[in-house]
UniProtKB/Swiss-Prot annotation:
Protein name: GTPase Der
Organism field: Campylobacter concisus (strain 13826)
InterPro entries per record: G_ENGA, GTP-bd, GTPase_Der, KH_dom-like, KH_dom-like_a/b, P-loop_NTPase, Small_GTP-bd
Keywords: GTP-binding, Nucleotide-binding, Repeat, Ribosome biogenesis
UniProt domain EngA-type G: residue ranges: 2-164, 198-369
Length: 462
């Protein structure tokens, strides 16, 4: 699929145009210069033709970080098919903008000069100030007023290939669940998890090495890596194929202490949570060179909150196996709610042991999406209740009639009971442990939901 890249200095409106063309808010927009530090990607349709739209980091030489962004942006432009170079129509053209535009023009790719913030008839006169760029294709637009964007879209469509009709999957396995169960009482096989992309969110506090880990996983310098805390603001998307499986990685914004979350980063935190709602497996990155913090524990709680498959990644590891065992014990003690999560040590910058993450992701995804046979499930539950009967409720017998899995990703199991409100959390934990002993459930949560006979899923009781 062809790639279209948006290039320009910070705060000229690239992210706003990106959101306008994508018809949804993907990139974070702000009046703060340089909000987009990493490249964002989205598949869009322009006049019936599909392409990948790339929102690059702002070009600015005012700091070392933005020099890195500039180098990455220019490299990304060379691998694109169409370039949209964006400038601020309310500012005077400068030599640097012209120099970069000339440099990009040498690539012999279709390139348009997009003059943003032409918000009125008076502003239209400013377009003439950019004549010395020598652009054959100039468009005065106002993203905020949505003027001129249609003309730009028509030009863009002329330089895109015809939309390719992708053959539909031969099965109908991508429909929604059919009433959750089939006639035999088993969970319906309506979703083909084997062919779906595995969505992986990389989470952790600022500067623990999330971007370095993403770069190591996809074997290229993708996210901007810097010692400046909080470099990644936009969640960074990367689609990568490994051993026949497609992985969608998202490097989420680093999370700071609550008191330090301000403005744009608060929005980034909200975006992070929204992304985790759509994630299958979370890579919780910890900095092994520093002591565990309360914030680490809070972030781990986010993964638990969204009931994701989880791998705990100890980054910057250069210690002995004995020290690894000690730290694992500390993590298990601090993160009791993630006791099911495997722990792996890596050095993202050096690429050490990073390759071991892929098979772990695949294993956990398989566990996360598995369907447990109802007969086997009830066999385990029956043996567990026989070995350790449920406590009575004020002398009254508490029974589990049967259990059935009604959802995958995460695994949700309904316990059909006579007194669902009387199931103590400690007995839930006991049943969960028994299920883990009997089935492959490494790295994934198990949600047990006690329900009264005839109770609907909407009335489920946590």
């Amino acid at each position: 699929m062809q790639k279209v890249i948006l290039v320009g200095k910070p705060n000229v409106g690239k992210s706003s145009l990106f959101n306008r063309l994508a018809r949804r808010r993907i990139a974070i927009t702000s009046d703060v210069s340089g909000t987009t530090r990493d490249t964002n990607k989205a598949k869009i349709e322009v006049e019936g033709k599909e392409c990948i739209l790339i929102d690059s980091g702002g070009l600015d030489d005012s700091s070392e970080l933005f020099k890195n962004v500039k180098a990455k942006t220019l490299a990304e432009a060379k691998n694109s098919d169409v370039i949209l170079y964006m400038v601020d129509g309310k500012m005077m053209p400068d030599d640097e903008d012209r120099a970069i535009f000339y440099e990009l023009s040498k690539l012999n790719l279709p390139i348009a000069l997009v003059i943003n913030k032409i918000d009125s008839k008076k502003d239209e006169q400013r377009e003439w100030e950019f004549v010395n760029f020598g652009s054959k294709n100039s468009f005065g637009i106002s993203v905020s007023h949505n003027t001129g964007v249609d003309e730009l879209s028509i030009w863009l469509a002329k330089h895109l290939e015809e939309k390719v009709q992708i053959k539909a999957d031969t099965s109908d396995d991508f429909d929604d669940f059919l009433e959750n169960y089939n006639d035999e009482g088993e969970l319906s096989d309506e979703i083909d998890y084997e062919s779906k992309n595995i969505r992986v969110g990389i989470i952790g506090r600022v500067n623990v090495g999330k971007s370095s880990l993403l770069n190591a996983l996809v074997k290229e310098s993708r996210a901007v890596v810097s010692d400046v805390a909080g470099t990644t603001i936009d969640p960074v998307n990367e689609i990568y194929e490994h051993d026949g499986r497609v992985f969608e990685f998202v490097d989420t914004a680093g999370i700071r202490k609550r008191g330090k979350i301000e403005g744009i980063e608060r929005y980034a935190l909200n975006r992070t949570e929204k992304i985790l709602e759509e994630t299958d497996v979370a890579l919780l990155v910890l900095d092994s060179s520093e002591p565990l913090t309360e914030l680490d524990e809070r972030i781990a709680g986010i993964a638990s909150k969204f009931e994701l498959g989880v791998i705990i990644v100890l980054n910057k590891w250069d210690k002995s196996s004995e020290e690894f065992d000690e730290l694992c014990k500390e993590i298990k003690d601090r993160f009791k709610f993630l006791s099911y999560a495997p722990i792996i040590s890596v050095s993202a910058l050096g690429g050490k042991r990073v390759h071991k993450i892929y098979p772990l992701i695949v294993e956990i995804y398989k566990n996360y999406t598995q369907k447990i046979q109802t007969s086997k499930l009830n066999e385990v539950i029956g043996e567990a209740t026989k070995a350790h009967p449920l406590p009575r409720d004020k002398g009254r017998v508490v029974k589990i009639y049967y259990a059935v899995q009604f959802k995958t990703a995460p695994i949700m199991i309904a316990l059909i009971m006579n007194r669902p409100k009387c199931l103590h959390f400690s007995y839930k934990r006991y049943l969960t442990n028994k299920l883990r002993e009997s089935f492959s459930l490494t790295g994934v949560p198990i949600v047990l939901i006690p329900k009264k006979r005839g109770e609907s899923d909407e009335d489920k009781e946590q």
